[in-house]
């Protein structure tokens, strides 16, 4: 009887998000499937249990071959150049289909068309995973945010972003020109999105809050390209002990300005600094 095996735990997803170029969850899905297709063909592994546990492990592959960033294109190039089974692998691997399935699971039939202009083909699910997402921000702390100019630079599309802002009850006070989405064609870690917001706010200083390597690199790129600016980078580590340790290990030696367990702690710290009460 086949044994059910989880091929990607939280640690693997974190590994991908920490290398840069894979900030997009849908591309991570495609990268995971591509890795296991490569491993299955390269090492003639048939059983799912062995596929996960026999070397090379996915974390070792990431650390050995993908640390330069560039995400999925880098992975595709490496397999094409180094695998004797590349042609067979890429006949099986359908990136567009994989991403659509992931989008359908996330948005469900309820939002798939509105968010992604797709008619669901593979997943028969009215309510997607987006309906299970909880709001991490304490609503009482919104008053702190509104003391500042607030902009959003996100990898989500405009319709999906507006859904989230509506859920937060932010649409009534954040103007559309303060939101840069994937519809603009700008993707992190390009500094262009932040620079557009900086120009619109006429600001030389700012703080960008994220949780991935691409978020950190976006700020780094902005400060390198525009010497007159000084943006700080803040990374939210979450309350998982492994994730907190990993993000501290990776980001602090690179000059991260703020590492916080959650966005609420970060906002309270900002408020204390503003009022002169910071330790």
Name each model feature, range by range.
Residues 208-258:
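Acidic, Mg2+-coordinating phosphoryl-transfer loop and its flanking beta/alpha structural elements
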Residues 257-266:
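Short acidic-hydrophobic, aromatic-tinged amphipathic segments that line or gate anion-handling sites
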Residues 122-133, 151-207, 213-227:
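Substrate-recognition "cap/lid" segment bordering the active-site pocket of phosphatases
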Residues 68-72, 77-84, 88-95, 101-152, ...:
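Short, acidic loop-to-helix structural element flanking the phosphoryl-transfer center
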Residues 266-276:
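Short amphipathic alpha-helix with an adjacent loop that forms part of the alpha/beta core around
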Residues 26, 158, 162, 191, ...:
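Short, surface-exposed alpha-helical segments at coil->helix boundaries
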Residues 1-86:
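Conserved phosphoryl-transfer catalytic core
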Residues 2, 39-40, 142-143, 169-172, ...:
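Alpha-helix termini
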């Amino acid at each position: 009887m086949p044994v059910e095996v989880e091929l990607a735990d939280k640690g693997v997803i974190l590994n991908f998000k920490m290398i840069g170029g894979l900030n997009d969850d849908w591309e991570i899905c495609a990268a995971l499937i591509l890795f296991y297709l490569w491993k299955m063909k390269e090492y003639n592994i048939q059983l799912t249990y062995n596929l996960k546990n026999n070397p090379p492990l996915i974390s070792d592959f990431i650390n050995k071959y993908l640390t330069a960033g560039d995400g999925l294109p880098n992975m595709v190039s490496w397999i094409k150049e180094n695998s004797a089974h590349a042609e067979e692998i890429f006949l099986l691997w359908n990136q567009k289909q994989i991403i659509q399935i992931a989008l359908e699971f996330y948005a469900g039939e309820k939002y798939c068309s509105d968010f992604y202009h797709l008619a669901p083909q593979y997943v028969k699910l009215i309510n997607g995973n987006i309906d299970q997402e909880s709001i991490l921000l304490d609503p009482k702390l919104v008053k702190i945010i509104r003391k500042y100019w607030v902009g959003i630079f996100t990898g989500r599309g405009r319709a999906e972003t507006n859904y989230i802002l509506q859920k937060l009850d932010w649409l009534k006070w954040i103007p559309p020109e303060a939101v840069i989405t994937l519809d603009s064609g700008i993707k992190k870690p390009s500094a262009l999105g932040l620079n557009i917001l900086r120009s619109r706010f006429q600001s030389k200083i700012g703080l960008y809050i994220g949780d991935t390597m691409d978020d950190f690199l976006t700020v780094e790129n902005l400060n390198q390209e525009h010497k007159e600016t000084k943006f700080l980078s803040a990374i939210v580590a979450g309350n998982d002990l492994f994730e907190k340790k990993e993000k501290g290990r990776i980001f602090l030696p690179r000059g991260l300005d703020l590492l916080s367990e959650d966005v609420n702690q970060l906002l309270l710290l900002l408020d204390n600094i503003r009022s002169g009460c910071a330790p």
